[in-house]
Amino acid sequence: MIINKTKDLMKVQPNILSLIGNTPLIRLEKVVAGFDGSFFTKLESFNPGHSNKDRIALHIIEEAEKKGVLSDGYTVIETTSGNTGFSLAMVSLVKGYNCILAVSSKSSKDKIEMLNAMGAKVYVCPSDVSADDPRSYYQVAKKLHSEVENSVYINQYF
């Protein structure tokens, strides 16, 4: 069954964040043949950052705004090894926040360049150190949070 959503797709959105979460639900048929029940999947790759992490980043930032811990002129700080960093950088950029990300040296050059292109300041930290080492991306993010006035440390891993 093909559903024509051209009218909805052509609707002007206030910004890219309004597209987060509006991902299609697809009925699975062939892959689940022989199983009882109905099976569906969400195409999270249809989010602007091509990941379900867009939902998470938007939710975290909006909750911080509601609680009053994040407002104009503030900086979002996080450790990341993947899509969460991109999503936080994107949401921060659109909402006007600064974004600082601490990443492992295992991160690809392309990923680091993409984070920079999204407006994030990226600190590349050695990957061959323990999590409690002051040079680890966990500790670097904590230190930056203590040094950067008006910052919020997301702390997704703990």
Give residue ranges: language-model regions.
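PLP-dependent amino-acid enzyme catalytic core
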Residues: 1-158
